[in-house]
């Protein structure tokens, strides 16, 4: 058997010296990663709950269900209003498209109340803006 060759460390050419770069917070890893914000209707749902039933609370699961409900209704109304605008060859969704979409999506008496409350809210907003 042949004798084993001695292992020698590989010789390296000296590396070029570069000016030391400033270490930033992200390079050192000390900066905390900011939590991504999740937009919900929770605060608004809570305010309405306190207006109607001041002594009643709401669980996190119930709040999640209510948030899903509001998102669902919003998407339905926005989708229907978008279709109505497209049918009329308009590129803008106005209050009229929203009102018609509400009448189409919500049943009977609920639609009437929603339209009257919506009209009241738009009037209040318009008078405050002027």
From Swiss-Prot:
Biased composition (Basic and acidic residues): 1-19
An example molecular function term from Gene Ontology annotations: DNA binding
GO cellular component: nucleosome; nucleus
Broad class of the protein's primary localization: nucleus
Glycyl lysine isopeptide (Lys-Gly) (interchain with G-Cter in SUMO) cross-link, renumbered residues: 7-8, 17-18
Positions where Phosphoserine occurs in the chain: 11
Its job: Core component of nucleosome. Nucleosomes wrap and compact DNA into chromatin, limiting DNA accessibility to the cellular machineries which require DNA as a template. Histones thereby play a central role in transcription regulation, DNA repair, DNA replication and chromosomal stability. DNA accessibility is regulated via a complex set of post-translational modifications of histones, also called histone code, and nucleosome remodeling.
Name of protein: Histone H2B.1
Organism the protein comes from: Debaryomyces hansenii (strain ATCC 36239 / CBS 767 / BCRC 21394 / JCM 1990 / NBRC 0083 / IGC 2968) (Yeast)
Upper taxonomic lineage: Eukaryota, Fungi, Dikarya, Ascomycota, Saccharomycotina
């Amino acid at each position: 058997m042949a004798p084993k060759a001695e292992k020698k460390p590989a010789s390296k050419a000296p590396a070029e010296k570069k000016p030391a770069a400033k270490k930033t917070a992200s390079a050192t890893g000390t900066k905390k990663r900011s939590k991504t914000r999740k937009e919900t209707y929770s605060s608004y749902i809570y305010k309405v709950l306190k207006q109607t039933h001041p002594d009643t609370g709401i669980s996190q699961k119930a709040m999640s269900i209510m948030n899903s409900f509001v998102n669902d209704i919003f998407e339905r109304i926005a989708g229907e209003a978008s279709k109505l605008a497209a049918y009329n060859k308009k590129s803008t969704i106005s209050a009229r498209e929203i009102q018609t979409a509400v009448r189409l999506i919500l049943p009977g008496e609920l639609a009437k109340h929603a339209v009257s409350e919506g009209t009241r809210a738009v009037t209040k907003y318009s008078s405050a803006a002027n």
